[in-house]
Amino acid sequence: MAIILGIDPGSRITGYGVIQCNGRSQIYLGSGCIRTASDDFPYRLKQIFDGVSEIIRQYQPNFFAIERVFLAKNADSALKLGQARGAAIVAATNADLPVAEYSATQIKSAVVGTGKAEKTQVQHMVQQILKLPAAPQADAADALGVAICHFHTSQSLVSLGGRANTRTYGRYR
């Protein structure tokens, strides 16, 4: 039995989702959003750190998974998103949690089956996979998707005996 905390980072809204994994089943434990209230950016980072730390204290997860930064058109937005991720990751490392990072494409592929899925498709599939009565809010659904992605990735590694295929075909690019 393992508990996975998934994080969808944002400088204004950071989504979180917590699932428990028993064998091949995934059980919903909780989800929501950390909403930062201040215009003072360093204080918003503190709110993210404190919020993630509290969620870790509340749910006692074994694993922490977070979405990787994507390339944004606006460099300032990308930097702020990276700093928000950093605040969440520091909260996880303070609790001695192993940190896993996944791209948006990996997360969408694990949850929906295609890396080009829309947000509404992710919400719908998260609802179906976790047997929720209603679709979660977009940021919380994305965070639950991160946790589901980590579950599927770790299950794949277990079935491979903890190692990937070492043969490589073709050229490295």
UniProtKB/Swiss-Prot annotation:
It holds the Pfam family RuvC. Its cofactor is Mg(2+). Binds 2 Mg(2+) ion per subunit. CDD domains: RuvC. GO terms for biological process: DNA recombination; DNA repair. It is an enzyme of class 3 (hydrolase). It is found in: Cytoplasm. Its EC number is 3.1.21.10. The RuvA-RuvB-RuvC complex processes Holliday junction (HJ) DNA during genetic recombination and DNA repair. Endonuclease that resolves HJ intermediates. Cleaves cruciform DNA by making single-stranded nicks across the HJ at symmetrical positions within the homologous arms, yielding a 5'-phosphate and a 3'-hydroxyl group; requires a central core of homology in the junction. The consensus cleavage sequence is 5'-(A/T)TT(C/G)-3'. Cleavage occurs on the 3'-side of the TT dinucleotide at the point of strand exchange. Homodimer which binds Holliday junction (HJ) DNA. The HJ becomes 2-fold symmetrical on binding to RuvC with unstacked arms; it has a different conformation from HJ DNA in complex with RuvA. In the full resolvosome a probable DNA-RuvA(4)-RuvB(12)-RuvC(2) complex forms which resolves the HJ. HAMAP family: RuvC (MF_00034). This is Crossover junction endodeoxyribonuclease RuvC.
